[in-house]
Amino acid sequence: MSLTNEQIIEAIASKSVTEIVELIAAMEEKFGVSAAAAAVAVAAGPAEAAEEKTEFDVVLAGAGANKVAVIKAVRGATGLGLKEAKDLVESAPAVLKEGISKAEAEALKKELEEAGAQVEVK
């Protein structure tokens, strides 16, 4: 009798971690393969390009007409002093925050755009 993939998955799911490690070792020996080598081959494949980006940079592209409001928004978002925030706004395009989550980046972009700035999320 042949087992379906679903039955095999259910059987594996019911095993303990130790039993699964032993199963993997037995399969590696039986088939002459290494699970680590297969994982590296899969990771290097085209799926890598399809992964969703998790860290974003917020770039101030321009201050717009209301520079004072943008400077206040930049100060609030970055914690910079007045002079540093003013210098940052005047040196646009400039990176405001790096490596933040998508939600945080979108919220910051919305806040700065409401103040009149042109903002990019990269």
Swiss-Prot record:
GO terms for biological process: translation. It comes from the Bacteria. Pfam families: Ribosomal_L12, Ribosomal_L12_N. GO terms for cellular component: cytosolic large ribosomal subunit. GO terms for molecular function: mRNA binding; structural constituent of ribosome. SUPFAM superfamilies: ClpS-like, Ribosomal protein L7/12, oligomerisation (N-terminal) domain. Keywords: Ribonucleoprotein, Ribosomal protein. Forms part of the ribosomal stalk which helps the ribosome interact with GTP-bound translation factors. Is thus essential for accurate translation. Homodimer. Part of the ribosomal stalk of the 50S ribosomal subunit. Forms a multimeric L10(L12)X complex, where L10 forms an elongated spine to which 2 to 4 L12 dimers bind in a sequential fashion. Binds GTP-bound translation factors. Belongs to the bacterial ribosomal protein bL12 family. This is Large ribosomal subunit protein bL12. It comes from Pasteurella multocida (strain Pm70).
